[in-house]
């Protein structure tokens, strides 16, 4: 038994009026840095200003002040998010065909952007059905609005105004908690209280209120919409909330109120809290009653979780105790010291959060198509493709960000004198073994995955199809993936006796779901083609991890540069006279990691786009015959590199290349322009700084001759600045090219 002295009561502490509100600093660019505040001598000044403006660590070493700045900045971020959301809702209210779409979501396509005729751009306003002309949107907002029970554009206006009010409130909060009542450091470090409030408040009460909204507002309104009732005839949300009889007409058990809850007769509520599984055949989305049930269950879990941590009352878990008890037989001190790291280094904390949030975002991408949550989402192929692509990119960026901040933690916040024989120290001590093994795995995966394709290209070129790896010749079936699919398809009767259908139709087993003559989802077959491309996924992901992990583990020191920590997070080379030491900073690893992240995600979204068009998406005839968009060509075409180039990139680019003169022509222009942005990046990535400095000198000479030379000396970009500009344009150009290619294609054929 552990006997503890009574814990001191947690006091909520703030400093009153710590920093005077003043706009004077705004008039002094770079006021946060003594060097930058002096003003520009050379053009490098503007780059340093942007690089350091939000690097709060470089402004002060006072952790409390840094914490307050970060906290305040978060409110600013939330304000921008509310402003953006308000804009989305305002467009839905002012420029959209939402009410028309609501009346016929299978034939009318969503649009919430109408182009003004200035020099002929009105060609972009395509006919989306129902007599409306505008740009087809693929964000999924219409589907979310229908699911949440919004039936008129007036409601969208009101929500837009509400979001503006919240944006203003967030701006105020950011000012208030920095200038008027700024929390002390102890408040930011009180993890138990933070966990309780975030778990019970944000996630618990948040889910509970959403479940309440879904039960009292969404479910009845969607019942009426599904039955074909005119949206204008449906009672308004507050009528359902205030008038129980209205709900009781749809769900008789509502008449009994909360009695079944308190008498533990919960099965009464099974009318609107269901456990069906599968998709609603009318809308092609998950059953709304399943979703409400899910949020209620999640709310209860998080409300319990939000009461688990020890604060003012001496009961519950302490994070420090949990971490320090975390010792294995082979892990030395285990997690001892991790608590101190995570409460004093916000970079370490952020790295963990970004890694988890990035992984979660990628999980979301995969669930949006396999378990489409909103009505009429599954048959809106443009939106499905956009949501998958968007969440994959975001997840990739967040994971690279995790490595970036882990490396910054290693350089700025890691104290090797206090860390001995804990898990982090042990990982660092055998980093050579980790990195060399990971490198071997990358080489193995690269040669073998690519080698299978090269073999197929060669056999195909030599006219020997019988010697190729394919479903019709030498089969390489993904037996483990098929086993996972099959296990889940059989679950409803076996391991999940309460469920009537599997979690996702993609597992197999069920009949396909079609809405309005279009396939929503069907069992997705996996074969040799998927086996091949999945090993390319394994390869690209492992290389990305290799680069990023090497950057973190060698951020402070390496055999090549033992004193790397003294050089900082980003530096070009280890000074003159030391050749071969460029591109070794932790920043450079993030820079290189971004390119491989881009490789990884590109292959994933290409695979998804082609696989869905080939094997899932398509139309269904009255006789039940399914015609897929690309007629099932994935299995035979994607097993060679040539097939990817010819039958995916080239064949499916025809829509964007031929879009001129049509309502899709903006995508054609973006396709061209984004290629240009991408190519522009190469000028920065393949350039020598000296080349540009020489050029600048002669241009300055000409300006001096004409007596028009500026006072600020022009300088070529530093090596790091050039790389930053290069990778930004590379990713921006590449992503925008893909976006134009995907959307022109899927809007034309989907």
UniProtKB/Swiss-Prot annotation:
Keyword Metal-binding: yes
Highest taxon of source: Eukaryota
TM stretches of this protein: 70-93, 156-179, 195-219, 291-309, 346-369, 385-411, 433-455, 531-549, 589-610, 664-686, 724-744
Disulfide bond entries: none
Amino acids binding chlorophyll a': 675
Keyword Iron in annotation: yes
EC number from the UniProt entry: 1.97.1.12
Principal EC category: oxidoreductase
Record membrane topology: Multi-pass membrane protein
InterPro entries for the chain: PSI_PsaA, PSI_PsaA/B, PSI_PsaA/B_CS, PSI_PsaA/B_sf
Reaction equations catalysed: reduced [plastocyanin] + hnu + oxidized [2Fe-2S]-[ferredoxin] = oxidized [plastocyanin] + reduced [2Fe-2S]-[ferredoxin]
Positions contributing to [4Fe-4S] cluster binding: 573, 582
Subcellular localization: Plastid, Chloroplast thylakoid membrane
Amino-acid positions noted as binding chlorophyll a in the UniProt annotation, renumbered to this chain: 683, 691
GO MF annotation: an example: electron transfer activity
CC per GO annotation: chloroplast thylakoid membrane; photosystem I
Keywords for this protein: 4Fe-4S, Chlorophyll, Chloroplast, Chromophore, Electron transport, Iron, Iron-sulfur, Magnesium, Membrane, Metal-binding, Oxidoreductase, Photosynthesis, Photosystem I, Plastid, Thylakoid, Transmembrane, Transmembrane helix, Transport
Binding site for phylloquinone: 692
Cofactor: how and how many bound: P700 is a chlorophyll a/chlorophyll a' dimer, A0 is one or more chlorophyll a, A1 is one or both phylloquinones and FX is a shared 4Fe-4S iron-sulfur center.
Pfam families for the chain: PsaA_PsaB
Family membership noted in the UniProt record: Belongs to the PsaA/PsaB family.
Subunit-level organization: The PsaA/B heterodimer binds the P700 chlorophyll special pair and subsequent electron acceptors. PSI consists of a core antenna complex that captures photons, and an electron transfer chain that converts photonic excitation into a charge separation. The eukaryotic PSI reaction center is composed of at least 11 subunits.
PANTHER family: OUTER MEMBRANE PROTEIN, OMPA-RELATED, PHOTOSYSTEM I P700 CHLOROPHYLL A APOPROTEIN A1-RELATED
General function of this protein: PsaA and PsaB bind P700, the primary electron donor of photosystem I (PSI), as well as the electron acceptors A0, A1 and FX. PSI is a plastocyanin-ferredoxin oxidoreductase, converting photonic excitation into a charge separation, which transfers an electron from the donor P700 chlorophyll pair to the spectroscopically characterized acceptors A0, A1, FX, FA and FB in turn. Oxidized P700 is reduced on the lumenal side of the thylakoid membrane by plastocyanin.
Classification via NCBIfam families: psaA
Protein name, per record: Photosystem I P700 chlorophyll a apoprotein A1
Gene designation: psaA
